[in-house]
Design a protein with these regions (language model features):
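Non-catalytic terminal segments and appended small domains
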Residues: 1-141
Length: 141
């Protein structure tokens, strides 16, 4: 409905490598219909999780915009950043992910970028309240 906003959680898990940032835009079909993102449409370097977008209908015709489950409605661009890689260390790391999914991504992060996703990094996330990480990290080789 017109001017109504909703939070939309992606089905896919997004992993932004620590040397990139992610930028999201609505697919042109929906942009022309009046769909817009209210929150910052970006994902920080090193972010892993499901994206939550706050979308709003700004249609000039004031008609509802229907997005069906599974319909692709956004573009996601990876942009290489300049300078030293600095991974996201915020409370939304691993948002809307199961322990099994998190464990899988931790293995990838440690294997591919172990020098960046090191013990200091994991401890900083634990301090944010992501206590479940201790249990997962000690299970890993």
């Amino acid at each position: 409905n017109y001017l109504e906003h909703k939070n939309v959680v992606s089905e896919q898990i997004v992993f932004v490598p620590p040397n990139c940032v992610g930028h999201m835009t609505a697919k042109s079909k929906y942009g022309r219909a009046g769909l817009s993102f209210l929150n910052a449409a970006k994902a920080h370097s090193g972010f892993v999780g499901r994206i939550v977008l706050e979308v709003v209908n700004l249609s000039n015709e004031r008609k509802p915009i229907t997005i069906k489950r599974g319909d692709p409605f956004m573009h996601f661009e990876f942009i290489t950043r300049v300078g030293e890689a600095y991974p996201y260390k915020g409370e939304y790391q691993f948002q809307y992910m199961s322990e099994e999914e998190i464990e899988m991504y931790i293995k990838i992060m440690q294997r591919e970028w172990g020098d960046i996703f090191n013990e200091e990094y994991w401890r900083s996330l634990e301090k944010l309240g992501l206590k479940f990480l201790s249990k997962l990290l000690y299970k890993l080789p």
